[in-house]
A protein has these predicted regions:
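A residue-level marker of the well-folded mature domains of exported/periplasmic proteins
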Residues: 1-252
Length: 252
């Protein structure tokens, strides 16, 4: 049997998302899949959907509070940071100064990617000398990196929570003629991110399998709607992308 999907976008607003979920409840959907706008604001969504007795599945961003019976389909965000940190430790022979470009501090992905990178590089003997929030935006990555460069501190690597901020950092380093001395890593393996890996400006990125998360979310929702059981967490693994294995990620 086929699945009828109704998809809406929340325009990055939690209040809009809650209203959309309430509309889905009123429409008596068989299951609801939510990619939360902010991971700290899922309480009202969870209460409303569970109160209506409708199966709920969260995808991509893990809610801060994940109650029993509500599965999460996504990737282990801390592991993304650990992959970045492991790559940098090896590339820098376990010595040097690292700065971290963080996404949105209200999101679990920001906290976990940052923690994964920081713990991994520090364990290897590198120093994290600063971290700043760049709201996932390229222009913020650029302006924060400019400020770091102006500070005169020695920076050997920039660990960015996503490719967009990493690309901004690369622009700032290119403008200052310092890209050759600094390794930049990102997360997402976006089209632009992959192009930068190919060009040799982005040392590495981390592939997040959005298609795998989406299909996993639908599979879980269908199973729950049919009275089946689903694991609490369905992990779709992150993968490190470098110049060596870039070809296998094209078009994924």
């Amino acid at each position: 049997a086929g699945v009828d999907l109704t998809i809406v976008a929340a325009q990055s607003r939690s209040d809009v998302q809650l209203n959309q979920v309430q509309d889905f409840i009123a429409a008596k959907m068989d299951a609801i899949i939510v990619l939360p706008q902010t991971t700290d604001a899922t309480g009202p969504i969870t209460s409303a959907v569970r109160g209506a007795g409708i199966p709920l599945v969260y995808v991509n961003r893990r809610p801060s509070a994940l109650p029993d019976g509500v599965p999460y389909v996504g990737s282990d965000e801390k592991y993304a940071g650990e992959l970045q940190g492991g790559f940098l430790a090896k590339a820098l022979n376990n010595t040097g100064n690292v700065v971290i470009l963080q996404g949105d501090p209200a999101q679990e992905a920001t906290r976990l990617r940052t923690q994964g990178c920081q713990e991994t590089v520090e364990k290897a003997g590198l120093k994290v000398i600063d971290s700043q929030a760049g709201s996932w935006a390229r222009e913020k990555g650029l302006s924060i990196t400019e400020t770091w460069l102006q500070s005169g501190k020695k920076i050997d690597a920039i660990c960015s929570n996503n490719d967009e901020m990493a690309l901004g950092a690369i622009q700032a380093l290119q403008n200052a003629g310092k890209l050759a001395q600094v390794k930049v890593v990102g997360v997402d393996a976006t089209k632009d991110g992959q192009a930068a890996v190919k060009a040799g400006t982005l040392a590495a990125t981390v592939f997040q399998d959005a298609k795998g998360q989406g299909s996993g979310g639908i599979d879980a929702a269908v199973q729950l709607a049919n009275g089946g059981k689903v694991a609490a967490v369905l992990d779709i693994p992150f993968e490190l992308v470098t110049a060596d294995n870039l070809a296998q990620f094209a078009g994924r």
